[in-house]
Design a protein with these regions (language model features):
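A conserved mid-protein helix/loop that constitutes part of the nucleotide-sugar donor-binding site
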Residues: 19-26, 181, 185-204
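Glycosyltransferase donor-sugar binding loop
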Residues: 41-45, 165, 186, 209-223, ...
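Short hydrophobic beta-strand element within catalytic cores of glycosyltransferases
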Residues: 270, 279-282
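Conserved acidic donor-binding segment of nucleotide-sugar-dependent glycosyltransferases
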Residues: 293-304, 312-317
Length: 356
């Protein structure tokens, strides 16, 4: 039987910490090489794990003409084009008649479609509206996100495919001993992700230390730095972006993980934090299965409930230990070696689906 040919659209450069890029690498590395041939893009230096793999083809994007390079490759007879985005190349491809793009099935992997509309850019809204509703197959990482797809682009989700974590790489430290508990936020430093709440928490809990890790956008890092300086707080730091190895060490050096964002799917950072044995605090708005409320952490409904959860964990090392151990155990069902089998089964079914 011929192998299923898949073109993944996210770039896989080694220094790319975007969640979609990280997910694509883990999936491609685990697809059965006897049944799949994966093609992936990079700009400068691809993840070294992807090199010299018999079933993985790496393509370097040129510095100019990227849209046409990607568009031409999309027309090269793939069975599946995975992780459809809202780039001009995807827009052009999806506006071709099915006969022109056959046999490719365009697959939209949904994380939280409504999150895209937070961006006020008219161009991005135009591209989003002209791409995602035209895909052939829809997957979602949770039931909540599947409902979001139905509500926002009026499409039925064909598969629920969670994302995973490498539990062999993300492991707890031998012990956690700090005079002051370390509370960690990891994510894009924008208002929607909620890092500003850590400044409020730092003022409320002076016996804990708070770390904000991640790249800033929309000038929000500067806003937060100004707030910290004006407050005179000494128990909080804004550490900027970090590499994956650095992130792992930071998680091992922390005691509590917090992501006060209202709009997510399965936040990858909660999987990584839980795998390193951290209890996690999140909002319950998006019903993430990565945190079991009261067992591996807390799902809160309000900012005040976030603060109450923090207060409990900061004050009780035993509770942190129990929840952290439960979080690590919970991550077994999110290990990429297990989760990738679901992706492989879905891709085989998608490839066998007749083109409309």
């Amino acid at each position: 039987m011929d192998r299923v040919r898949i073109l993944f659209l996210p770039g896989v450069d080694a220094d790319n910490t975007n969640a979609q890029s990280l997910n694509v690498r883990e999936i491609a590395l685990r697809l059965d090489p006897g049944r799949f041939q994966s093609t992936l893009w990079y700009e400068h230096d691809p993840d070294p794990r992807l090199r010299d793999r018999p079933a993985i083809r790496l393509l370097k994007l040129p510095s100019h003409g990227k849209t046409w390079t990607i568009f031409r490759e999309m027309l090269s007879g793939y069975d599946i084009i995975a992780y459809m985005d809202y780039s001009p190349a995807s827009y052009l491809f999806l506006h071709l008649p099915h006969s022109a793009r056959s046999p490719a099935q365009a697959v939209f992997h949904a994380e939280a479609p409504s999150a895209q509309f937070v961006n006020p850019s008219t161009v991005l809204r135009f591209l989003y509206g002209g791409t995602f509703p035209r895909c052939d197959v829809y997957t979602a990482i949770t039931e909540f996100v599947a409902r979001d797809v139905c509500n926002n682009i009026k499409k039925r989700v064909n598969f629920i495919l969670p994302v995973g974590v490498d539990t062999k790489a993300f492991t707890p430290p031998a012990e956690r001993e700090h005079d002051s508990p370390v509370v960690l936020f990891v994510g894009t430093v924008i208002e929607r992700k909620g890092p500003q709440h850590l400044i409020d928490a730092a003022g409320r809990f002076p016996n804990a230390f708070f770390r904000i890790v991640g790249a800033g956008r929309e000038g929000f890092s500067g806003v937060l730095r100004q707030r910290v300086e004006q407050s005179g707080l000494k128990n909080i730091s804004l550490d900027g972006p970090k590499t994956q190895p650095e992130m792992l060490e930071i998680m091992r050096e922390s005691d509590i993980f917090i992501l006060p964002s209202r709009l997510e799917g399965i936040p990858k950072v909660t999987l990584e934090a839980a795998a390193t044995g951290l209890p996690c605090i999140v909002f319950r708005d998006y019903e993430t299965p990565s945190v079991i409320d009261g067992v591996t952490g807390f799902q809160a409904g309000t900012v005040e409930e976030i603060m109450q959860a923090l207060e409990r964990l900061i004050a009780d090392p035993s509770l942190r230990g129990r929840m952290g151990a439960a979080a690590r155990k919970h991550m077994e069902k999110f290990d990429w070696d297990f989760v990738s089998r679901q992706w492989q089964s879905a891709y085989l079914e998608i490839a066998a689906k007749p083109v409309r």
